[in-house]
Amino acid sequence: PPDGAEQQFNDWYNNHHMPSHVYGVSGFRSGQRYKIPDRPDYLAIYDLASSETLTDEEYRDRKYRPDAPTKKMLSEVIAFTRYVADEISFQVRDGLTIDDAFDAGMILAAFFTVPDDAVVEFIDWYETEHTPMLLANPGWRMARHMRIVDADPNPFTHMMLHYIDGEHVLDSDAV
């Protein structure tokens, strides 16, 4: 958010952006937003029916012809980064539902640049070795693996979203 305008940004985001630009556009299944502790920085995750949702006329109209409140707010936002990704897989810790996993207290995003000739091996390692090791930790709820298809800036090929109970989980011996 703009300096000194975090409350104004949150009002716009919660009461204008989410209802009209997320829930109001077909193809958007859900939207969650997470705040970085002690900083006015946020991570927003929008689950789409597919990345094709972003080429739909309804979405493009709202993105490229924003209404006045959106145009004003976006002109003041700095350090905006956007990744569009297709989900490769997700794994939920045994005994939890997906809804339980989404109720995590913290999201950890990890980004990788994987060379084309190593993608198959990387995916196999991530899904059969690394993720099960993480999910053995009781505070690790879910891991989502995504292939980045569009980014600004564009340094990464894969993104992982880890749904965990809190920062204390990162201190576990299992991690």
Regions found by a protein language model. Name each.
Residues 1-175:
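Macromolecular interaction modules
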